[in-house]
């Protein structure tokens, strides 16, 4: 298996990490990708699950929490354990730690907001990815212009 492509989305102050995560999930789903969202905790997983139900009133992203729902699972699965099942396409890592299963994915997405804890943890992830010679892309996301 080829090394994963790594994408860091660096959010300016004023960009909500949870809302941006939902936006990325929605875009990837519409492009027919299958995603595994790795959360820091069960609470974060439940919060993201709830947010995806209300993120957009005009559309729906089929998703479930890992271990719940139908077999096969919908194209978007949210988990917090050290197991991503059979998902191989895109990993969105919302955890402060790097999951051991990241290598099974074609693409890994890391979302960096302005909190010191997230920035420090994801700097460590960046250094690790560099040490593995993974292809790394950085995307700066500007805050919406207030009118």
Locate predicted features.
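Long, hydrophobic N-terminal alpha-helical segment
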Residues: 1-44
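Short, solvent-exposed amphipathic alpha-helical segments in soluble enzyme
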Residues: 24-26, 52-55, 108-109, 125-128
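Conserved beta-strand elements of the Class I
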Residues: 36, 90-92, 109
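Short His-Asn-centered micro-motif
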Residues: 38-40, 79-81, 92-95
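Short, charged/polar "capping" segments at the starts of alpha-helices
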Residues: 43-47, 117-119
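Helix-adjacent hinge/juxtasegments
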Residues: 49-86
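SF2 helicase motor core recognition
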Residues: 84-104
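Glycine-rich, aromatic-bearing surface loops/beta-hairpins
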Residues: 106-147
């Amino acid at each position: 298996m080829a090394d994963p492509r790594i994408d860091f989305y660096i959010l300016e102050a004023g960009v909500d990490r949870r809302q941006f995560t939902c936006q990325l999930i929605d875009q990837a789903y519409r492009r027919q990708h299958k995603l595994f969202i790795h959360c820091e905790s069960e609470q974060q997983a439940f919060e993201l699950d709830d947010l995806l139900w209300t993120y957009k009133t005009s559309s729906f992203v089929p998703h479930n929490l890992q271990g719940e729902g139908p077999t096969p699972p919908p194209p978007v699965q949210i988990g917090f354990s050290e197991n991503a099942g059979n998902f191989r396409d895109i990993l969105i890592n919302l955890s402060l730690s790097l999951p051991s299963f990241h290598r099974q994915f074609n693409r890994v997405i890391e979302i960096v907001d302005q909190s010191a804890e997230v920035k420090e943890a994801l700097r460590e992830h960046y250094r690790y990815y560099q040490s593995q010679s993974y292809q790394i892309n950085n995307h700066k996301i500007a805050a919406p212009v207030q009118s």
